[in-house]
Amino acid sequence: MSIAVFDSGVGGISVLKSLVEVMPNEDFIYYGDSANAPYGTKTLEQVRALTCEHAKELILNQHAKGLVVACNTATSAAVRILREQYPDVPIVGIEPAVKPAMLFMENPRVLVMATPMTIREEKLKKLMDRYRHLGEIIPLPCPGLMNFVERGDLYGDDVRQYLEELLYSYSHDEIDAVVLGCTHYPFVRKMIQEVLGDRVRVFDGGNLSLIHISEPTRRTPI
């Protein structure tokens, strides 16, 4: 039996890589729904339906013993429902690294980059509200950014221009940290760092799922 890793495209590959490093003796199934990407500009109902459909395939037909929803948008839309539907299967989602970003210094000013749907959802709003007393949190929807990653355009002029326009006001402001709230965004992390400057700390929440998935699945024999 394998651990399934699901994402709306190629973004979750970075999460899969980390899982393989932590659990080298496990077998993994990766499913990237590039045919329906991007999820971040879809409605809640659309994302929920797609996520539940693919989870059903991976758990019931592919017999996955655990599921990592390696997509912030799908996590916000459906992970609670999936846990109710499959109570005996360890299911974890991805959470933007707001907590470590707010704790790395006193009174930080933190930019949270995410898809429009992730920004709208209550899950992220509640997470940000939990740490607002520690500093300033600025949510920034990034429509279209994951499309560059899906196309493999990680270093070209088009993605640089997109990021420069998106981040212009923040590259000249006192931003202390940026949270990459989508598993696609680490693929353009270097360019984000270049646009914002070296003084800005970049946080990626992709590894937060590893602790939660590793122990329960290790107790389930392959």
Regions found by a protein language model. Give the residues of each.
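Non-catalytic structural scaffold of enzyme domains
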Residues: 1-214, 218
